[in-house]
Every structure is written in C-alpha cells, then in structure tokens.
Amino acid sequence: MMAAAGLESAWEYLITHFSEFQLASIGTFLLHESVFFLSGLPSLLFERLGLFSKYKIQKKSNTPDYQNRCVVRLVLYHVCVNLPLTILSYRTFKFMGLRSTLPLPHWTVVVSQVLFFFVLEDFIFYWGHRALHTKWLYQHVHSVHHEYATPFGLTSEYAHPAEILFLGFATVAGPALTGPHLFTLWVWMVLRVLETVEAHSGYHFPWSPSNFLPLYGGAEFHDYHHRVLYTKSGNYSSTFIYMDWLFGTDKDYRKTKALEEKERTKHL
C-alpha cells in the first residue's frame, strides 16, 4: 500500500508540473534513453575490459573503435528518428485512448496488458524479422543490424531507419489496440528495452532470465542468430521461443546446442 501511495504521489507531481504531451513524448523519450544506455553500457564495458570472460558467449570481441561507432550512430538514430516518431505518435495514441490521469491502473490491469503486449509483439516481430531475412530485405535493410556478429547490449537498437519503423510496429501494436494508461506504456517500454538489451548482451550468466523463465529466449538464443549466416540463422523471435519451435526455425540452433553439450560432457 505504501509503495502504491508513493507511486500515486510521484505521478501526481508529474501530471501537475508537465502536460500530457510533454510526458508522453519527451518524457517517454528520456525514460527510454536512460534505461537503454544504463542497461546497455555494462556489456560494452565488460567486453572492453575483459570482465566476466567465462560467461561471454563468443570468444571474439569488438574493438573499442567498433563499439564507439555503434554508440555514435545510435545517438544519431535516436535523436533524428526515434525522437520525432515519439513526438508525432502522441496524437495517434491519444486517439486510441492513451491517458495519464489519476488514479493509476490497478496492478492486475498493468500485468495483464503488459503480458498481452509481449505475446502480440512476439508474434508480429517473428514474422517481420523472418521477412527481413529474405535476400532483398536483408541486403538492403537488415544487414545493418547484423554488422555486429558479436553483439553487445547497445547493438540491440543499432538498425537501419526502415527497420526501426518496420519492427517498431510490433512494439506499439499492443498499446495502440488497448489504449493504455501512460504508466502502463512506460512499464511495457522499460521491460521491452531490458529484454532486448539482455538478448544482445553477448553474456550468459547463472542469473540470466533464460535460466529461470520458461519459453524465454535470452542472450544464448539470440547470439546464435547473429553469428550464423543470415539464410540459416533462424531464432527470429524477440522474447519467447515458441514461435521458432512451432515453425521449426530453431532446429539448427538446437542441434548446435546438443553438440556443444556433448563436447562439454566429454571433457568433464
């Protein structure tokens, strides 16, 4: 109850001092940037400093210059593409029912809507991502994202502007359909950013979510997608693995994992 009261007080401060447009556009952008860079920078530093190397999925590492190139382009993309899109999308979300007033939605509403967003996003993302691995779309659009065959957290949003628009639809489809409270939208965005950063981190730790959450892909699952030739990579899902399992696009990954496990047990 105290936590809920604290959230309500903090939210009241925000809606008193800022307009809904400011919160939904600039506030959303600043929250995204904060969560993205704060969660993405650690894996960059781990790789650069050689920390936690026993948990690194690939032995290869990106050079500091190659890492810096990613960061500079990300800032450019975010300011020139993401920020204008966030500002321009406010009217659309408002039309679809976005609100920011008190009271905040009950936690059961937040949880159920966010779960729906994850499931819907995963379904749309799978087919969109799979389409991006067709020859023409890969060569002209998706190859930008795959410039980093050894991913680290920040590479999760390193992509061609057309891909940002194309796959970004999967992320906003759920909120656009339900017209959620801005608070719910922020919870969804934070969790989705943390998920994609972890999936691109390049590290699999004992505490990684995939060790505890059924059907969750995680870093190992997506790292394979980056290091294999684009026509054979599979593993197209964003968060969960059931779509790849249903359509057989994870078969090569599972074979590789089985062989790696066999080799590992040989040396025990």
Swiss-Prot record:
Q: Which cysteines are joined by disulfide bonds?
A: none
Q: Which InterPro entries match?
A: Fatty_acid_hydroxylase, Sterol_Desaturase_Related
Q: Which UniProt keywords apply?
A: Endoplasmic reticulum, Lyase, Membrane, NADP, Transmembrane, Transmembrane helix
Tissue expression, per UniProt? Expressed ubiquitously.
Where are the membrane-spanning stretches? 26-46, 70-90, 107-127, 164-184
E.C. number = 4.1.99.5
Q: Name one GO molecular function term.
A: C-4 methylsterol oxidase activity
**Any one GO biological process:** sterol biosynthetic process
| One cellular-component annotation, GO | endoplasmic reticulum membrane
* Record's bilayer topology term: Multi-pass membrane protein
UniProt-listed Pfam families:
FA_hydroxylase
Catalytic activity field: a long-chain fatty aldehyde + 2 NADPH + O2 + H(+) = a long-chain alkane + formate + 2 NADP(+) + H2O
Domain annotation Fatty acid hydroxylase: ranges: 114-249
Location of the protein in the cell: Endoplasmic reticulum membrane
Q: Which PANTHER family match?
A: STEROL DESATURASE
Subunit annotation: Homodimer.
Q: Which protein family is it in?
A: Belongs to the sterol desaturase family.
Its annotated function is as follows: Aldehyde decarbonylase involved in the conversion of aldehydes to alkanes. Core component of a very-long-chain alkane synthesis complex.
Name this polypeptide is given: Very-long-chain aldehyde decarbonylase GL1-8
Instruction: List the source organism.
Output: Oryza sativa subsp. japonica (Rice)
